[in-house]
Every structure is written in structure tokens, then in C-alpha cells.
Amino acid sequence: MISRTLLKRSLPTVQFLRPFTRSSIRRSAHEEDLVNLNELPRQKSLEENYVPLINPTEKYKVQIEELHKFGTYIMACLPKYVQQFSVWKDELTIYVAPSAILPTMLFLKNNTACQFKQVSDVTAADYPSRTNRFDVVYNLLSVRHNSRIRVKTYANETTPVPSITPLFNGANWFERETYDLFGVFFEGHPDLRRILTDYGFEGHPLRKDFPTTGYTEVRYDEEKKRIIYEPLELTQAWRNFTVGSSVWEPVGEGKDFTPESFKLPTPEPEPEKESDEKK
């Protein structure tokens, strides 16, 4: 009986010792595979890692020269339509009038040196201070020559731009998106209607004069169990902040850190003019 009790008391110690001894054996076995950090090569100095900045004109020097030649070639082929061209880095942009869009696109699509048979994007940019406030931008891709070109024209709120959908079927939805977001009309488009905004939407969201909050509020009405449109209600009344004013209310007297040499002298009050009765 005594031997059995001693054996039972010794068992827990054996159970705790076995995993400890195994882990020590594993640790000693893997110590040979560990890497000595002191023997690793040191990191290079900052001077060796420093890469000098390269001027973009030098980096794209070869491409810029070739694009200038290609732009000159297009102007020589279409002197009646192409007004000018510009090159920035590896991008060529030609500028045409709205009436020259179709013949220019036809030339860029079918000419052997061009072969721009794919429309990547059609978009616009809004410049409200200009007479023709919209720049309509066409991005074309030539798979055969692995090159791209950008065509720009101009328009306003009432002047339409000829649609290139008869030449490029892929421009259908691009022109609808440009009409929806900017309000540019494309003459000859087979289905010129909104594509992103909701039915009955007012205005064009990407115009610079379009308010950030929009004109109406769209929400789900629990009583009517449907989406409803309501006039927009702002939680704060509209305020016109003049230059130099702060949106936050000042607290305390405040401190002026402007040096004395930069401060303007306080003007003296003008003398009061005597009235005609006193004279």
C-alpha cells in the first residue's frame, strides 16, 4: 500500500517534467539553425541608397521628340481641323473645334499610322469663368501601335457637340455619363438620357456651380412605404463668411503674433466738417 501511494504522488511530477525536457531538447536542436545577427551584412549608408531626382523632360526625352513629330504629322494631314497640339511627358493632346470632331476621329481611327480604334473614356471639365465653360475630352487607344492620344474640344450649356457613337459604339454610355454629370449635349446620339442619377434629377452634379448638398433630399418614408423626395432642409441657416472671418466663435482677448514692423498704423480720425448753417 505504501509503495502504491508513493507511486501516485510521483506521477504528477513526471507529467510536468516530460514536456519540459522535450522542449529543451527541441530548443537545443534548433539552435544550430539560428542565424547570428552579428554576422549579417550591414545596411547601406544613406548616400548609397540616395537616388537623384530626374527631370521629367530628360526621362521622357525620346518619347517627347517622337510625339512632337507625330503631332506635327497630324496637323499636316488635318490643317483645316486641328488647331494645335501639346505634349506633356508621354501624353499627346490635340485641340479641335466641335465641328471638327467627326472628321478628326475618322482620321485617327482609319489612318494607318494612327489606328486608334478604341475609346477608353469620354469626359469633360468645367471652367465657369470661360465663355465655353466645358472642355470635352476624348481618350483613344491604339492596340496595334500600343499608344494613346487625347482629343479636346469645347462647348457650353447650349452648344451641342457631335456624337462619335456612329464611329465608336463604346462611346454610347460615355457620352450619356458626360451629359448626365456635366450637361453637355451630344448631337446625333441615339439615346441621350441620364445614366447615373435618378429619374427627374435636377441639375448636373459635376458642374462647379452645383451645390454640394443638392436640391432635394431622398429618404424612405415609413408611412408611405416608398422612397420620397423632399425639399432640402439644412439644420443651420446659410451664412456668408467674408474674407478674414472665422467660423468659430472667438473666446478671450486673443493674441496677435504679427511683428510690429508688419502692422499697419492706426489711421487718425478725420476732422468733422462744419455744416453750412454754422458758416
From Swiss-Prot:
Disulfide bonds: none annotated. It is found in: Mitochondrion inner membrane. The keyword S-adenosyl-L-methionine does not apply. Induction: Expression is down-regulated during stationary phase. Expression is repressed in the presence of nitric oxide. Keywords: Membrane, Mitochondrion, Mitochondrion inner membrane, NAD, Oxidoreductase, Transit peptide, Translocase, Transport, Ubiquinone, Virulence. Core subunit of the mitochondrial membrane respiratory chain NADH dehydrogenase (Complex I) which catalyzes electron transfer from NADH through the respiratory chain, using ubiquinone as an electron acceptor. Plays a role in cell wall integrity and is involved in osmotic and oxidative resistance, yeast to hypha transition and the ability to damage and invade oral epithelial cells. This is NADH dehydrogenase [ubiquinone] iron-sulfur protein 3, mitochondrial. It comes from Candida albicans (strain SC5314 / ATCC MYA-2876) (Yeast).
